[in-house]
Structures are given as C-alpha cells and as structure tokens.
Design a protein with these regions (language model features):
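Phosphate-group recognition and catalysis centered on beta-loop-alpha active-site segments
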Residues: 2-317
Length: 317
C-alpha cells in the first residue's frame, strides 16, 4: 500500500478555489457594470421634496433685473420685485476677508470704475463700488451689496437664487458663509443656492440638507457673446465632463440638487426628458420673443431672462 501524496488532494482544492475566485470576480464585474449603467444610463423620476410646484412657470429676472437695471445690484432686485416678478437670479463671490458679496464678473473692471479682482478686495472696498454709472452715466448710488443684504431685502417679496461662483474644487468657505446667513434669517423657503460646480452643491447639502440647491449646466463652452463681456484673464472654461449629459446624469444622482437651471440652447431632447421626469427646471436665458415662447410652452418650473417683463407678459397671456 503506497503512502498518500498530499499533492493529490491539493490540486482539486486549488481548482475549486480558482473557480470560486473566477465566479466572484465575474460577479463583481457584473455589479460594477450594473452600477455604471444605472449612474450613467438611467434617468429615474425626480423624487425631491423641498420644491413646491407653482401653478404656472415662474419668471425670474437674470442678474437682478435683466437689461432694465445695473447688473447684480440691489437697486435692480428691488425694481424687479416691485414689477411683480416671481424672483431674481444673481451671482455671489467671496471677498479677500471672506464676505459673500453679490457681483457677477471675477474682476470689477467692466461693471465699475475700479479695477482688480473681487477676491483681492475687502468687503468695504467692494461695497464702495457703484454699479450705476457703467449702466447709465446719470445713475448714482446702485452700490454693490452683500448676500446678507439681499436675503434681508427679498424676504416676503419673492425668491432669491444666488449662483456661488467657485471655479475650482478647493474649499473656499463660500458654502458655509451662505448657509450661515440662510439659517440666521430662516430663509430656506425663499433662497436657492445654485452653481455650475457640483462639488459646491454637495458641500452645501452636507452643511444643511434643507437648503435648496440648483445645478446649472449647458452643453457648450462659453459662447462668443458671453466671452465678449469678460476680461480674457477671467475666462474659466466649463470642464468637458460637465458638458456631457451622461456624466451630468451621474452627478445628479450623487449631488441630489433640488432644481436644475438649464441653458436654453441645451439639446431639446435632454430638456424635454428632464421636465417629463418631473425635475423642477429653470430655463435660462431665453431673451428673444420666439425663444421665450418656446421655453414657456414646455411648462418648466420657471424661466430666467434678461427680458423678464416680456417673459411675464407672454406667460400671462
């Protein structure tokens, strides 16, 4: 009788282990494919709970009061709300001393008599700048104001949507400052924080899940009209991934914005699909009458226009 060879049983055991490993690897691969297919290929129905559906599309004034008043000024916002508009869309940036001010361009040159970047100026320096004369030489006193001033002024009069301008991924503190002010004024029901940058919106939700957020997007990089009004050194290109709908589909699942703010030139099939899925969609910025009519006919949550009075008239017809 021969002595058993340990190697005789080891080979089947190795075969069984190898088979289990292959099956486990295949299962992991299948799971990964399914996850990726869901993230990038599936568009589920909107399930947010913080947005109340209006009976008709809302009309917001772009940059305060569109073409009717100085860009991003409280002066403009007061006149837009007095005109009966549902809300206003403005832009927020941090100053050198970490105050959140409302201002569109990264530099102050185009809109004021001063020069330099917003990030390099103190809050006091920014608030001393008058937005009036560059809009109309006869207009004085339309000074830059803080986000807090806007929140205080808009309360009870309409909705304030503020784009937080953060070009990169590094934390700047802008989200914390915005959330602190919303909490201080119990402004959750009339302030929306928006951004092209999904990381910013993710941080906002981590700070306070009840703050309403809006993801802004477009299909192209900046068009010549937008480029023409920005200093060459201030142009921040929109990253390629944020211009691809399949990637934005995944971003929406991870970041979970409450609303979408979609450029009116985005692929119409994308726009129609998101509205059909129940997303509260703002369409920006249809300004020509035909573009306004097309946007309003889609029955979006709202439109943001540089011609808000005409948009309001068309909506109410």
């Amino acid at each position: 009788m021969g002595t058993p060879n340990p190697a005789d049983g080891a080979a089947p055991r190795r075969g069984r282990a190898s088979g289990w490993a292959r099956r486990a690897l295949a299962a992991c691969g299948l799971a990964l494919v399914l996850v990726l297919a869901y993230l990038f290929g599936c568009e589920p129905r909107y399930r947010g709970t913080l947005v109340v559906r209006p009976p008709r599309p809302l009309v917001f004034a772009h940059r305060g009061f569109g073409d009717h008043a100085p860009d991003n000024s409280l002066y403009a916002v007061e006149r837009a709300l007095t005109a009966g508009l549902d809300g206003v869309d403005v832009d927020g940036q941090l100053t050198r001393d970490s105050e959140l001010v409302i201002f569109h361009d990264l530099s102050v040159d185009r809109l004021t008599a001063d020069t330099g970047h917003v990030r390099d100026k103190t809050a006091a320096q920014m608030l001393a700048l008058d937005l009036g004369p560059k809009y109309d030489p006869r207009l004085r006193g339309a000074n830059v104001h803080t986000f807090e001033d806007f929140v205080r002024d808009v309360k009870g009069r309409g909705i304030l949507m503020v784009e937080l301008k953060v070009p990169g991924l590094a934390a700047s503190g802008i989200e914390r400052r915005a959330v602190e002010i919303i909490q201080r004024y119990a402004a959750h029901d009339y302030v929306v924080l928006s951004s092209f940058n999904p990381v910013v919106l993710y941080r906002v939700k981590r700070l306070d899940p009840k703050v309403r957020t809006a993801l802004i997007f477009m299909d192209t990089n900046w068009n010549p009209e937008l480029i023409a009004e920005i200093k060459p050194g201030d142009v921040v290109n929109l990253p390629w991934p944020l211009r691809q709908e399949f990637i934005r589909r995944a971003i929406r699942k991870i970041v979970r914005p409450d609303l979408l703010s979609i450029n009116h030139q985005v692929d119409e099939a994308v726009l129609d699909r998101l509205i059909a899925k129940g997303w509260p969609v703002f369409i920006w910025t249809p300004d020509e009458e035909n573009a306004l009519r097309r946007a309003l006919a889609k029955r979006p949550y709202g439109v943001i226009s540089d011609q808000p009075i005409r948009a309001q008239q068309l909506r109410d017809q």
